[in-house]
């Protein structure tokens, strides 16, 4: 009887721990939604909240127009464990911080360890965005022998033209596989469909109409002297101060 009670208590404790973890992960997802990180889309797997599906759209310089799929893996005890999450791309990407064999992004230079309450997944995704936007800046303070792809670093520093050629190969490969059959049956896996005017046309027109109304509203506000005619720019708090990865930095 005592053994049954002990087992029951252990089961209850495990259930409570799991529920608490699920709420923490949901809170992380809500923060990402609020942050609106341009060109980055993620969603937890339907089957496993520790596995997230993601897509990154390159918008600047070397990786512009690339569509790169990745998986975000959270440690079993996330976020209480100091172990770092992992970002693993589905395809090879030529970048000094991405391993050419495992396709994993090295985040340790920005996050030496995971600090529960201080570090958040939206910051991690912003860092990923930053290393693609400015790869040279992302390795400025990293020793060459600590980089995952020293060849990429060498070309980035000494032969930009060849570096650009290699990244364009990555972009072409990413676009060639954008409509591939999903690698999993998980309903949350992000998929793309080719444009069909009869299906997607009305949605596109609705988006255009909404943008037109938004621009018209902005124009009217500008003509009226800004916010409610009071003048002056709005002030307050932002989630992240430009050039930093700290939450709630004063603008």
Swiss-Prot record:
Residues 211-251 are annotated as: Disordered. Pfam families: UQ_con. InterPro entries: Ub_conjugating_enzyme, UBQ-conjugat_E2_core, UBQ-conjugating_enzyme/RWD. Signal peptide: none annotated. Residues 20-176 form the UBC core domain. It comes from the Eukaryota. CDD domains: UEV_AKTIP. Residues 225-234 have a biased composition (Gly residues). Belongs to the ubiquitin-conjugating enzyme family. FTS subfamily. This is Protein crossbronx. It comes from Drosophila willistoni. The gene is cbx.
């Amino acid at each position: 009887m005592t053994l049954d009670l002990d087992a029951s208590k252990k089961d209850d404790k495990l259930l409570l721990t799991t529920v608490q973890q699920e709420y923490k992960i949901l809170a992380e997802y809500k923060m990402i939604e609020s942050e609106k990180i341009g060109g980055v889309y993620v969603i937890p797997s339907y089957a496993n909240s520790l596995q997230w599906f993601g897509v990154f759209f390159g918008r600047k310089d070397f990786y512009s127009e690339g569509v790169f799929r990745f998986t975000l893996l959270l440690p079993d005890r996330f976020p209480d464990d100091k172990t770092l999450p992992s970002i693993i791309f589905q395809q090879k990407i030529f970048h000094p911080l991405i391993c050419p064999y495992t396709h994993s992004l090295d985040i340790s230079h920005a996050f030496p360890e995971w600090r529960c309450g201080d570090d958040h997944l939206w910051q991690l995704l912003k860092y990923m965005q930053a290393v693609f936007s400015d790869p040279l800046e992302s390795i400025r303070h990293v020793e060459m022998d600590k980089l995952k792809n020293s060849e990429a670093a060498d070309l980035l520093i000494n032969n930009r033209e060849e570096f650009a050629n290699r990244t364009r190969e990555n972009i072409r490969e990413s676009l060639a596989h954008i409509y591939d059959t999903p690698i999993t049956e998980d309903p949350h896996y992000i998929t793309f469909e080719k444009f069909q005017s009869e299906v997607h046309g009305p949605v596109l027109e609705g988006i255009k109409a909404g943008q037109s109304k938004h621009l018209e509203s902005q124009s009217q506000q500008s003509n009226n002297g800004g916010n409610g005619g009071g003048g002056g720019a709005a002030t307050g708090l932002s989630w992240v101060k430009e050039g930093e990865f700290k939450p709630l930095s004063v603008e």
